[in-house]
Amino acid sequence: MEYSRRSLTILTLILVAALAPAPAFGSAIIGRNVTGATLSIDRQGRAHVSYRSGGRERSVVAWGAINARAPSTHTAQVKFRLRYGLRGGGVCLPYDGPPLAWLLKACKAQDGSYWALQSWVRLKPNYGGTRGAMELHLSHWRGALPALSLYQNWAYGKYRHFFGRLTYRGRGVYGFTATGHGAPLDSYGRNIYVDTFNSRYGKGWHRENSFLTHHRGHTLGDFCYGFFPHFGHPSGQGTKYRATAEGPGVTPVVMWAADDIGAYDATVQQQMQSLERSWGDPKCRA
């Protein structure tokens, strides 16, 4: 790796996502820490969601968006119209679409499109966090899902290094503006949320970090991350990893998971470095 320690520290400061809740531009966050969530689709193609939260029965109707637009500085990303407190109902035809991460409920609509409820903890403290609000996400799509690909290799021969891409229909998923902590400020930006298993943080799953996809170079929607000791915290290298991202627009949440790559392999390292360099991202110069 050609990173210097100073540049890695600066890069980490740029990429760390803010822990405060940021605007939800992807699959709509319907509620937090909910129980008993149900989903049905009416004859008008609207989704009816009911759930219990804060000791109360709640409901919301969603319509007006499907799939996602390609990144643009001129047109906002698609988003649902939501009306809370409106009760109604419909049917949930059997789901026959692709497997989904963090799935609670999925339905096929009469027009052949799909709706899904997914529940996961998006925001946790970096470098070892385990707790946060369980968010309920609603999505609507037809066709292929977003794709989250991730590759492992080594930095300095010993630290774990990740790089990858978030794509939709073959194009990178990325935004144009963000806070200094990496929280998207437009409707296109996306963060990658990485968890590590049985690391020095402790047994089970712990949050390692979260960071933006990039819009530099000729391979857009890419990202990279090194499992170095950060700000007094140990390296988060674990026995396995998972990475989760909200899809663009109102597409579903997607996840990647794999075991740790293991001991250093010079041949694999050369292959992975060549791949990362071919993407041309100045932030990810392997």
PLM region spans:
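Bacterial N-terminal signal peptides
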Residues: 9-20
